[in-house]
Amino acid sequence: MPPPPGPTAALGTALLLLLLASESSHTVLLRAREAAQFLRPRQRRAYQVFEEAKQGHLERECVEEVCSKEEAREVFENDPETDYFYPRYQECMRKYGRPEDKNPNFATCVKNLPDQCTPNPCDKKGTQLCQDLMGNFFCLCKDGWGGRLCDKDVNECSQKNGGCSQVCHNKPGSFQCACHSGFSLQSDNKSCQDIDECTDSDTCGDARCKNLPGSYSCLCDKGYTYSSKEKTCQDVDECQQDRCEQTCVNSPGSYTCHCNGRGGLKLSPDMDTCEDILPCVPFSMAKSVKSLYLGRMFSGTPVIRLRFKRLQPTRLLAEFDFRTFDPEGVLFFAGGRSDSTWIVLGLRAGRLELQLRYNGVGRITSSGPTINHGMWQTISVEELDRNLVIKVNKDAVMKIAVAGGLFQLERGLYHLNLTVGGIPFKESDLVQPINPRLDGCMRSWNWLNGEDSAIQETVKANTKMQCFSVTERGSFFPGNGFAFYSLNYTRTSLDVGTETTWEVEVVARIRPATDTGVLMALVGDKDVVLLSVALVDYHSTKKLKKQLVVLAVENVALALMEIKVCDSQEHTVTVSLRDGEATLEVDGTKGQSEVSTAQLQERLDLLKTRLQGSVLTFVGGLPDVQVTSTPVTAFYRGCMTLEVNGKTLDLDTASYKHSDITSHSCPPVEHVTA
């Protein structure tokens, strides 16, 4: 075996080879991580020239002939590689024979022993390259891999979420950023941006679309709920949720609670429960036990009936104090049968009128001042010899010659019937018809020298027979009844053939005691409320407590106007309806329309059609209708006078009037002292 080259020669050869290699090699740039792996503080074979030299020595020393461990040490020039090589070298000889056997597998086995990357111990999937070291090796890992053999996945997501703004998914040797639902991954593959789903008009269908971070919401108006299946807003039937204490009516997007107004109830501030309708203005309701109210019986029948019997001929003497604002009615009747002899003292146009019939011959006389001014005055009727004398405040206003006396002889006794506040027979039997109903008050009466003391005891025991101590002009509605008329609101114009025109003009002068109640209404067949004007203390659609006057056709409010109900003052409510027009005014201020022009015309057309049928005009309340048929069903409480189509309504001429309603007198507001 030739001697190995000396150290100086070997070093020179190595430097020359290194020089040649540096001239001919291409520049190689490694990433920082790869470079760092190469610069580990361990001895490495950095240059290929040393490997080639080592292989030459190895072939000469250990392949062509058997080498000892010391000779192998001279080849590798270090202990680690020698210690690694020599036991494996001996294993190659055991498996393939000695060098002199010339087995090619032996040569291959020996030549591969110094290269510790053959076979490659590094994980193939995670290794970029294997670096042979002195008795060792180094696995240069690909990005995302670690460990000695590059077989350990690096979890990039464990450090700052891998740089992902939302979701980091670790994968073998890698990772991937992802976004939550409703976000999209941007071009940097790390950032996420919200997706605006509302840019697609079909996202929510009929509902409003509101974009949210990573999502969206389909919104409906209050009272509606969104159906994701049909992509529409569907009405919520709140009435199925038992929200109302009494009656509930569902409507698109809302609901309305109703209370039994005729039972004295209205909606509470929560708009769901009911509460009592209580007066907010106190009226002076005190009555006098020494007074007799003449208007208690709407039928026109007398409130008092007396029958006198005498053994001797007797003359009539009647005296009383009287007070009224009523222009017409009967004070009292005295006499016998309708076809015999009698007198009726009444009022017509505010003046005293005497109708009399003696022996079948009737007469009428009227004289004296107007006395329906609401002040007390003393009236007397005295039967003298062949004369009747009528006085007002002791002044004679009438003196009528008569033939005979009012007491009639019958079965040996002289009889006289006397009735107060009405007549004992039909109006048609009068000399001239008169409305017998009289809203008047009588006191200090004296019939035939006081032989009627029982009347006073009867009046004391019955407050309905008593008068208010103080009254003013107007009609008083106590809140528990109504009146109605049969009025016509249509007419056929001769100028345009048979075309039917209609008009409803209402002027109501009111001084309310409560904030809820029907002022007037038109009611058709089957108790359908065609039109109503009423006080109400809430706005039904806005569900807001507010004192209002409402004009409605059936259950649809056409107009609303605010009113100070509880200020103790008189207010004027004006309503005008005709083709194409519906207005509501309170104290000269026009109300706000609640419907569109098309909706208004639709309601007016319906009203016009209904007015051509049977219609009753109700004042102060309604019959027993459904609470849902009109905005208000409660009775009105307070003072009111009413004009309809230019004519003042006289409650004495109504088709019906509740007996507690006073036609021409109203108690004043009670002034409460602090």
From Swiss-Prot:
Positions where Phosphothreonine occurs in the chain: 609, 617, 633
Q: Which residues form the signal peptide?
A: 1-27
Q: What does its PTM field state?
A: Gamma-carboxyglutamate residues are formed by vitamin K dependent carboxylation. These residues are essential for the binding of calcium.
- Give the subcellular location: Secreted
Q: Which domain of life is it from?
A: Eukaryota
The record's GO molecular-function terms, alphabetically, read: calcium ion binding; cysteine-type endopeptidase inhibitor activity involved in apoptotic process; growth factor activity; phosphatidylserine binding; protein-macromolecule adaptor activity; receptor ligand activity; receptor tyrosine kinase binding; signaling receptor binding
Domain annotation Gla: ranges: 50-91
User: What residues bear Phosphotyrosine in this entry?
Assistant: 636
Listed binding positions for Ca(2+) are 326, 328, 437, 652
Under the heading SUPFAM superfamilies, the entry gives: Concanavalin A-like lectins/glucanases (SSF49899), EGF/Laminin (SSF57196), GLA-domain (SSF57630), Growth factor receptor domain (SSF57184)
Q: Under the cellular component aspect of Gene Ontology, which terms does the record hold?
A: cytoplasm; extracellular space
GO BP annotations listed: activation of protein kinase B activity; animal organ regeneration; apoptotic cell clearance; apoptotic process; B cell chemotaxis; blood coagulation; calcium ion transmembrane transport; cell surface receptor signaling pathway
**What keywords are annotated for this sequence in UniProt?**
Calcium, Disulfide bond, EGF-like domain, Gamma-carboxyglutamic acid, Glycoprotein, Growth regulation, Metal-binding, Phosphoprotein, Repeat, Secreted, Signal
Claim: RNA-binding is one of the keywords in the record: no
Q: Which residues belong to any copy of the EGF-like domain? A: 113-151, 153-193, 194-234, 235-275
Domain Laminin G-like intervals: 295-467, 474-666
| Residue numbers bearing the Phosphoserine modification | 68, 614
Q: What does this protein do?
A: Ligand for tyrosine-protein kinase receptors AXL, TYRO3 and MER whose signaling is implicated in cell growth and survival, cell adhesion and cell migration. GAS6/AXL signaling plays a role in various processes such as endothelial cell survival during acidification by preventing apoptosis, optimal cytokine signaling during human natural killer cell development, hepatic regeneration, gonadotropin-releasing hormone neuron survival and migration, platelet activation, or regulation of thrombotic responses.
- Tell me the protein's name: Growth arrest-specific protein 6
